[in-house]
């Protein structure tokens, strides 16, 4: 006996044989099942993938409280399921259900702030605490500091962008205390290059001022020897002493009283410079270049030396014009040779720098009131070297 559906189909298709009716009914049933499966799949795809519904066959366990999750939605973090209320920071107990990120370490859950505070890679070189990724910092060489920790180790003065500072053993010093530290460790007469070499290459980024202006040492004068009495233009120094040279840069600012750096000359350097000064008081750039090659000194050092020599020469001329008596020892100084008293070298002889190192040099002697020149190869006679 046919059921109700079959009877209804038979009445609708009364003109069709029974075999055809049975095939049509099976096809309709197959299509209805297919449509039901498609509708179920569409409903599943429309749900939130981040918070999937629980399967009624196997309920999940919460990784926080350990209980079953019967809620429609749950959280998935660190490959584990969590109740919405159970996912929180283990330090500050902040609920992380609405946070964009969370961090896990050794099975514990942390918020962003607590994770960086405890496990941050960057640490302040002063307080050794962690530095978060969103925090403003100060960098010096390879060290990183909090803004509040970037202070002078001596006076705790806060250093900001643009301030001058120095570093020693990872400690930060303000400009004044860093200079005091260097003055206490190294003698003040050391040059900047020597000081930088001994201090392990400490860089002083603020040394950009000009040199200090200080008076030189009291001048010493040599008594006349071997019957020669001539104005000594360089009476303040001899071959064994060091001349003072003003430098463009000093290791300390002009506000502090420090000794001027000194440059020492060797015997052959002084002989060459003094011999040329007797010929030309103001060498030009070409002569300075030749002198630099001859002596191994820089053009700047040579310029300063000739400048100092000209100043000393003028002082001696003024002293002689004012009375011709040296106040230091009371010696009478003769007048310098005038322009018409004769040249130091024969008129036909051109003096070059190569002549300055020749053992046969021009000798200046005093005969009555005239200045004569003659050639001498004897080392016992007075040469230009002996005059200074």
UniProtKB/Swiss-Prot annotation:
A GO MF label: DNA-binding transcription factor activity, RNA polymerase II-specific
GO cellular component: nucleus
Residue ranges for the DNA-binding region feature of this UniProt entry: 267-326
Sequence segments annotated as region (Disordered): 239-263, 321-356, 369-388
Subunit-structure text: Interacts with LDB1 and LDB2.
Chain's role: Involved in gonadal development.
Protein name per the record: LIM/homeobox protein Lhx9
Organism: Rattus norvegicus
Gene name per UniProt: Lhx9
């Amino acid at each position: 006996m046919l059921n109700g559906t079959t009877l209804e189909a038979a009445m609708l298709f009364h003109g069709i044989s029974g075999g055809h009716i049975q095939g049509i009914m099976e096809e309709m049933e197959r299509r209805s099942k297919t449509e039901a499966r498609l509708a179920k799949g569409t409903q599943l795809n429309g749900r939130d993938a981040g918070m999937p519904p629980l399967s009624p066959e196997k309920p999940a366990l919460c990784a926080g409280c350990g209980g079953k999750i019967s809620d429609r939605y749950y959280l998935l973090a660190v490959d584990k399921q969590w109740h919405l209320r159970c996912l929180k920071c283990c330090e500050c107990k902040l609920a992380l259900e609405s946070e964009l990120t969370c961090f896990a370490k050794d099975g514990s859950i942390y918020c962003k702030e607590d994770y960086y505070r405890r496990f941050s890679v960057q640490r302040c070189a002063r307080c050794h605490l962690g530095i978060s990724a969103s925090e403003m910092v100060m960098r010096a060489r390879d060290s990183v500091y909090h803004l509040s920790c970037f202070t002078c180790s001596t006076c705790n003065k806060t250093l900001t962008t643009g301030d001058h500072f120095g570093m020693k053993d990872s400690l930060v010093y303000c400009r004044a205390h860093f200079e005091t530290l260097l003055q206490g460790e190294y003698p003040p007469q050391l040059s900047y290059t020597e000081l930088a070499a001994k201090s392990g290459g400490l860089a002083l980024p603020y040394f950009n001022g000009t040199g200090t202006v200080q008076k030189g040492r009291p001048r010493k004068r040599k008594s006349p020897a071997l019957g020669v009495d001539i104005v000594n233009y360089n009476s303040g120094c001899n071959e064994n002493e060091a001349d003072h040279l003003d430098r463009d840069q000093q290791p300390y600012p002009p506000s502090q009283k420090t000794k001027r750096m000194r440059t020492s000359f060797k015997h052959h350097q002084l002989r060459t410079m003094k011999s040329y000064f007797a010929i030309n008081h103001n060498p030009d750039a070409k002569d300075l270049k030749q002198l630099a090659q001859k002596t191994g000194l820089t053009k700047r050092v040579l310029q300063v030396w000739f400048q100092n020599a000209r100043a000393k020469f003028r002082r001696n001329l003024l002293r002689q014009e004012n009375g011709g008596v040296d106040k230091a020892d009371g010696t009478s100084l003769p007048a310098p040779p005038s322009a018409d008293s004769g040249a130091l070298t024969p008129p036909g002889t051109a003096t070059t720098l190569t002549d300055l190192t020749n053992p046969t040099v021009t000798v200046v002697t005093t005969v009555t009131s005239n200045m004569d020149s003659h050639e001498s190869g004897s080392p016992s006679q007075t040469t230009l070297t002996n005059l200074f």
